[in-house]
């Protein structure tokens, strides 16, 4: 089933080279746009140990010509049906198409027993993502997500700090992420872009799935959501381009998420407060820990001064070596299938992000706090209403 080859394996210290026999996962890529081309080049160049590019599905002739010129011996498929007909030539499918096609393509190839690796978001409706997850479980195939931002050293360090309990009991998190500035030229670049009928949403479905994934990765899904969502605030369209979200947890933890595509210069700053101090992640590249000398609980027990402050010290954390986050995700996917290594992000993570996104939209449309997850029927009816409104415009 899998081709074999020898390749160099480096130890963690990268001081020794060890040859060993390794299987290769044969991957077929669907979608040869900007990210699809990037992924294809990485795999073809051997940047992903354990993975080989077996085929690419591309519908336009210019892309097909480029594929044949730059990727010799890689099969080019004109459409998904032609690719499915050659199912014996690949083991897994990487889906890098517009997100509205992720679910039907995933179902098509899962039914053939092919492992799936999907770009974000997994799908539009959480109910549809659940259906794909169920199909993958039925067929015994892997379902991975390309949530590459989890592999950035800063976010990995933040996750390790949270998991270790270094912040104590968590109280609050505030994430301001408005570094997504998009000019009208971007929104006009394709007829389907920034529309309810084409993309089924705007800012929260296009730009923010990575950060919603990391929110639930760090803190879990909230119990309730309230979204103050603005539609076409900075642009002449009907979808969302600015949002202020409140996440509520039964534990008492509270979160705020602020994002927009029409503000510049923007920032990407996450601050998390716990009983033992504050963690700051700046631009996804630097991490600071402002550590209390005593936790707020301990200080409250021993302090006798009326306006006392807790002594604290700010330090920057040393981060691990920066590696290509996409290569890490792809190699992990291959190792999961070939060796049983746990996935960095699987279909359940794609489902959680879809559930959170659906809840945010429903809250924004109805201007009320909603429980997570919401009923799929409510979300889908709300989406259809906005699509119909857009079509009448």
Predicted regions and their residues:
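Hydrophobic residues in well-ordered beta-strands that form the structural core
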Residues: 78, 118, 143-145, 281
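Rossmann-fold dehydrogenase core element
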Residues: 131-148, 169-172
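C-terminal glycine/acidic-rich active-site capping loop/insertion
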Residues: 24, 274-348, 370, 381-393
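N-terminal Rossmann-like dinucleotide-binding module
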Residues: 10-71
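Glycine-rich phosphate/pyrophosphate-binding beta-alpha loops
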Residues: 209, 234, 258-266
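C-terminal capping/lid region of NAD(P)-dependent oxidoreductase domains
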Residues: 22, 141, 168-172, 362-382, ...
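Beta-loop-alpha module in the N-terminal Rossmann-like domain of NAD(P)-dependent dehydrogenases
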Residues: 71-135
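Predominantly a Rossmann-like dinucleotide-binding segment in NAD(P)-dependent oxidoreductases
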Residues: 149-236, 367
